[in-house]
């Protein structure tokens, strides 16, 4: 008992003098100290102390043995993870078994090679040995495949010899001379996805492609512009606030040209200044500034103390492409 008190006092004095922190009793996950019940009363211990420990079944020390030594260092116990999981690679049905029976240690990863048409869940290609075992479990399951016969390509060809492609497989195609992809390149690629091929290959005559669609005043396209558009591509336009779109919202690429773009018609801006000049105000409204679209009817009335100086019909003015004729009161 006296020896234990001396050890504790020595450690306390060392800490008080700014020396390194001692080590508490080690918590060895999936293992433990040999004779730990006998050793526990002597903790904490000084830097430099070491003890033999063991690992549970399915675990091993970093040196690969059943037991080893754990050391108290300035940074704590070393090794920090005394017991590591052992994972043995299982036999793979529908896969290649070059790793069958091989041991991997916690933190190690390895690639899994499955037969064509098979793969790991979620299209993964590697598995990792973790504290709880393999993640994901090494098994080759039937996966989505894409057939070369489902590809329709005009004015181009696919040079690959395979007829079946696994999920996420990308293949290249080339266009014949005088033809190009939608991006203007001589070749492109498509990918096998869960619902089939990502797209059908496109090889179009260079003369049939369109450049960016024409700009319009007081409006813009609703999508980012491309450098090249394939035939029958459509682009949508929209106008700035208060402007009215006249014509079709869309233009279409055909024979290398775009269809007629729409126009954005100016609104009529009814200002307090113009109304004061004519001694009028908006009927039933108190706006100091009012926007009206082409075709809208704007109703005016005379200010208090003034009488109409123009026809009664003029007080129901119609907005025509940004122009409105104001009535007048005297």
UniProtKB/Swiss-Prot annotation:
It holds the Pfam family Sushi. One of its GO terms (cellular component) is blood microparticle. Disulfide bonds join 23-72, 55-83, 87-129, 114-140, 146-192, 175-203, 210-253, 239-264, 268-319, 302-329. PROSITE patterns: SUSHI (PS50923). It is found in: Secreted. Gene3D superfamilies: Complement Module, domain 1. Residues 22-84, 85-142, 144-205, 208-266, 267-330 form the Sushi domain. Expressed by the liver and secreted in plasma. The gene is CFHR3. PANTHER family: COMPLEMENT FACTOR H-RELATED (PTHR45785), COMPLEMENT FACTOR H-RELATED PROTEIN 3-RELATED (PTHR45785:SF4). It comes from Homo sapiens (Human). Residues 1-18 form the signal peptide. This is Complement factor H-related protein 3.
